[in-house]
Amino acid sequence: MPAITHTKSKRISMLAGPALFLLLVLIPLGLDLKVRAALGTVLWMGFWWVGLPVDPAITAFLPVVVNALFSLTDMDGIISSYAAELVFLLAGANLITIAWERTGVDKRVASMMLSLVGTSVKQQIAVWFLAATLLSAFLPNTVVAAILCSIAMSMLKFVNEGDLKKSRVAPLVLLAIVWGANNGGLMTPLGGAMNLVTVAYIEELTGTEFIYTDWVIQLLPMSIAITVVTLLVLLLTKCEQRTLEGSREYFREMHQAMPPIRREEVLSLAAFILAAVLTFARELYKEWLPNLKPGYIFLIFGSRMFFLKDKEKKPVVTWEFAEKNLMWGLYFLFAGGTALGALVNGSGAAEVFAELISRIQLDSEIVLIFIIVTANVILSDVINNTACAAVTIPIVIGIAQGLDLPVIPYLWIATASYNISYTLPTSIRAIPIGHGLEPKYMFKKGLLNSVLVIISVTLVGWLCIRFWPGFGVLTLN
């Protein structure tokens, strides 16, 4: 995790977080105490995550502390976040990749990728971003981000770019992966649970089965806009370093000169590939093995690394080695973001936020779209996007019906906004932070991208409503 130095700004952040929390708790503001305490927790954690007065993993325990003192929601819902299935996915993937370090397969994979993709920084950013975007169109974004970040870090360490506090390239590569995994979910209904919430509401509204091709076609303009804007932000971000160490030919020769792959390398690589394949093929066997979810698949294969022996019959991974090299802070940070979402949702703060938006009287269609998109982006940055969809979709439907507007186009626009969160280290954005990315760096770059993407979604959504007669027209069974 990022190193902490007690500068003046950090001391200010240390005091500002709890001070804002107390301010919200003590001043009524016409809101229930539970709602004020939940919103205060959001501000507290946000200040500490960006200002880093303490390690981000420590901040991640604040939902437990606040809920213990104020009883905002059921404590079981908060505590369960720290032992959620996706936490085990991160731990299992981490166990496999530290086995890669011991066997040397990380160098083999890195040299192969560098020989194929090349060492141009912009090319690396584009390839990682597009790979994450396309994969997350069909797969859970946490799985995509965890797998690709692990592989990318192996490559970056190989070319002496593994220290994210010193490297100019590594932060951009990890942002490319996590932003791509975030954006890609919009492309198909399979891109995330938040999309299925939208599908469920559409089926309820129409009284008929939803045809998935409608999603792909009608959300394509916004998907393209989000992808293009985000990629441009990444490529235009100033980076003084234009290439990684070495050349494509150098890495191709290095890869070809490596000794024959050893048994332990094959097994550690196979563990990762099999875990990924079983995760991606989950639909084929989930009826027979309902509890074998991706997190537990990776944990099974990760645990197997303790039993893997090298040619001298010594364990490849010992507990002592794992204890020192596992990214414990990442697990707590990821869980803390989920716990914060549970706190905000369980306290009723999310519903209050959504209702405040619904009360705004608007005559301008484009301003209404802008407010819906902006509100959803802010809320999905704090709570997970599935919870955000569950809370706000009924509000969006109510607003559209109340203003006598077509409902489906506004549902499409709202759905796009659940897939464009970039600033806080919650949800999948905790993964690069766990690898060492500074939360402040993510916040600054993410804020710029959020503003540009919000504007692009607003404009494209408005143009679709105004000039595309088929936007919102569904193929009904």
Locate predicted features.
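Hydrophobic, membrane-inserted alpha-helices
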Residues: 17-22, 40-47, 128-133, 177-180, ...
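C-terminal ends of transmembrane helices
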Residues: 44-51, 98-112, 116, 307-319, ...
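Residues that define the loop-to-transmembrane-helix transition and helix capping
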Residues: 57, 76, 123, 171, ...
